[in-house]
Curated annotation (Swiss-Prot):
<keyword id="KW-0687">Ribonucleoprotein</keyword>
<comment type="similarity">
    <text>Belongs to the bacterial ribosomal protein bL35 family.</text>
</comment>
<feature type="region of interest" description="Disordered">
    <location>
        <begin position="1"/>
        <end position="27"/>
    </location>
</feature>
<dbReference type="InterPro" id="IPR001706">
    <property type="entry name" value="Ribosomal_bL35"/>
</dbReference>
<dbReference type="GO" id="GO:0006412">
    <property type="term" value="P:translation"/>
</dbReference>
<dbReference type="GO" id="GO:0003735">
    <property type="term" value="F:structural constituent of ribosome"/>
</dbReference>
<dbReference type="InterPro" id="IPR021137">
    <property type="entry name" value="Ribosomal_bL35-like"/>
</dbReference>
<keyword id="KW-0689">Ribosomal protein</keyword>
<dbReference type="InterPro" id="IPR037229">
    <property type="entry name" value="Ribosomal_bL35_sf"/>
</dbReference>
<feature type="compositionally biased region" description="Basic residues">
    <location>
        <begin position="1"/>
        <end position="15"/>
    </location>
</feature>
<dbReference type="InterPro" id="IPR018265">
    <property type="entry name" value="Ribosomal_bL35_CS"/>
</dbReference>
<protein>
    <recommendedName>
        <fullName>Large ribosomal subunit protein bL35</fullName>
    </recommendedName>
</protein>
<dbReference type="GO" id="GO:0022625">
    <property type="term" value="C:cytosolic large ribosomal subunit"/>
</dbReference>
<dbReference type="Pfam" id="PF01632">
    <property type="entry name" value="Ribosomal_L35p"/>
</dbReference>
Length: 65
């Protein structure tokens, strides 16, 4: 059986919290920001949790997290 490896792209995008939930960054905050309102950009600042339907696939990409 081959060695299990962590997907490096996933390890840079996600963090496992102490409670076991997975933290992710918000999308739509990199460019084309002039047409977005200040309120919208402010709400995109924080982090969010990965949705429960995607948790299994994220955990499969990070077997040691």
């Amino acid at each position: 059986m081959p060695k299990m490896k962590t997907k490096k792209s996933a390890s840079k995008r996600f963090q496992v919290r102490g409670s076991g939930s997975i933290k992710r960054g918000q999308a739509f905050k990199r460019h084309i920001l002039t047409k977005k309102t200040t309120k919208n950009k402010r709400q995109l600042r924080g982090s969010a949790a990965v949705h429960e339907t995607n948790v299994a696939s994220v955990k499969a990409m990070m077997p040691f997290a």
